[in-house]
A protein has these predicted regions:
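Alpha-helical elements of Rossmann-like donor-binding domains used by nucleotide-donor carbohydrate transfer enzymes
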Residues: 57-60, 213, 279, 300
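Conserved beta-strand edge residues that scaffold enzyme active sites
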Residues: 11-14, 232, 298-299
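Generic enzyme active-site microenvironment
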Residues: 8, 232, 277
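Short alpha-helical patches at coil-to-helix transitions and adjacent helical residues
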Residues: 51, 55, 204-211, 277-281
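Ser/Thr-centric signal marking residues that sit
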Residues: 5, 51, 55, 227, ...
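C-terminal cap/loop subdomain of S1 sulfatases and analogous C-terminal strand-loop tails that border
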Residues: 19-22, 71, 84, 235-241, ...
Length: 333
């Protein structure tokens, strides 16, 4: 129907994108700092912080590359807040004065749920001091047993000298105090949780700031009132519930996925009906006036966004996790 399409940021599939008029994607998961991209088949490294770079590329495409006489569909896919939660340099001190409340089930004993106890996403035993919590000391005295220490040190070494100077100013005192305190047991577990939460929230703050940049561009260029904006993720995440980080296990914290939609003229407030990510494609096609292919999974929830009642809307969902052993050793369920 005449739409220009673009994919910018995290792709994380084996193949290169097809069916897009323009694409500029991170290689693999992408790196937080000085990430490598593939731009329409050509590899290029860009200096800076991934969240800012992806946003810069997206705004540049809207402003300077697309044909402004045509409608467009743009996917802006960020690496953040994926592991390892490396904050932007300007956010390193953010929330320093905050102590995050512990989830009530942080020390879950998994009574009657033995399979849930046999995984490798425990903050206490699986969150790596160097890879996840940035304890890459220059004396090389902090060592870990998860197999991720080298990768953590490589992430630090990938920073340029200017970036390292700012990074060190923040983390060197934290590393020194950690060595001095020699934490064990619950004290270590709760220290890990606080470090994790601080870095995660800093990374989220950067996402929030950059979403604001996109919205500001749309507003300033008269695009807000004829553009549907979708903010979502590929799953929820554990923020210490059951003592975990990551996702995969089908408790509500992981199963429920963020989804915010702004549809000009659409319903305001919450929509209570259950939707899935397989519904996104049909919804976007429906809005664009394109017939949804018969073999496409999911259904359009555009009527729900307009405030319409759909009497036969789904009342249940099916979940199946089958990738065992794979990463984090979550059992099939």
């Amino acid at each position: 129907n005449g739409y220009q399409t673009a994919m910018i940021g995290k792709w994380h599939l084996v193949s290169e994108p097809t069916g897009f008029n323009y694409w500029d994607i991170l290689i693999g998961q992408g790196d937080y700092y000085n990430p490598k991209f593939i731009k329409n088949g050509e590899r290029v490294q860009r200096e800076g912080y991934a969240t800012n770079i992806v946003t810069d590329l997206a705004i540049n495409w809207m402003d300077s590359i697309r044909d402004k006489s045509k409608p467009f569909c743009l996917f802006i896919h960020h690496k953040a807040p994926h592991r390892t939660w490396m904050p932007d340099l300007c956010d390193l001190d953010l929330y320093d004065d905050v102590t995050y409340p512990m989830p009530e089930n942080f020390y879950d004993k998994y009574e009657g749920r033995i399979p849930a106890s046999k995984q490798e996403m425990s903050i206490i035993k699986d969150m790596d001091l160097v890879y996840d919590l940035k304890m890459a000391d220059k004396e090389n005295e902090i060592h870990t047993t998860t197999g991720l220490e080298e990768a953590g040190r490589n992430m630090y070494n990938a920073l340029n000298p200017e970036q390292k100077a700012v990074w060190d100013k923040h983390y060197d005192p934290i590393i020194a105090k950690f060595k001095q305190d020699k934490l064990t047991g619950k004290a270590l577990a709760e220290w890990k949780y606080q470090q994790y939460m601080h870095d995660y929230m800093r990374v989220i703050h950067s996402i929030d700031r950059n979403v604001g940049r996109v919205l500001k561009y749309l507003e300033e260029n008269g695009l807000m009132e004829n553009t549907m904006i979708v903010y979502t993720s590929d799953q929820g995440f554990y923020m210490g519930e059951h003592g975990w980080f990551d996702k995969r296990f089908m408790y509500e914290e992981s199963f429920r996925t963020p989804l915010l939609v702004r549809l000009p003229g659409g319903k305001k407030g919450d929509v209570d009906e259950m939707v899935q990510n397989i519904d996104y494609g049909p919804t976007i096609l429906d809005l664009a006036g394109v017939e949804v292919p018969a073999d496409m999974h999911g259904v359009s929830f555009l009527p729900l966004l307009k405030g319409e009642k759909v009497p036969d809307w789904r009342k249940s969902l099916y979940y199946h996790f089958y990738e065992y052993p794979a990463e984090h050793a979550v059992r099939r369920h």
